[in-house]
């Protein structure tokens, strides 16, 4: 795992991953969940 939160976007921790979403410019975890 690469820092967990950096790679895995948990719905429970979506508050913490919000910053990550900005980097991707996406609000939906769908495309990224598929990659994971």
Swiss-Prot record:
It is found in: Plastid, Chloroplast thylakoid membrane. One of its GO terms (biological process) is photosynthesis. One of its GO terms (cellular component) is chloroplast thylakoid membrane. Keywords: Chloroplast, Membrane, Photosynthesis, Photosystem I, Plastid, Thylakoid, Transmembrane. It is a single-pass membrane protein. PANTHER family: PHOTOSYSTEM I REACTION CENTER SUBUNIT VI-2, CHLOROPLASTIC (PTHR34787:SF1). Belongs to the psaH family. Possible role could be the docking of the LHC I antenna complex to the core complex. This is Photosystem I reaction center subunit VI. It comes from Pisum sativum. The lineage of its organism: Eukaryota, Viridiplantae, Streptophyta, Embryophyta, Tracheophyta.
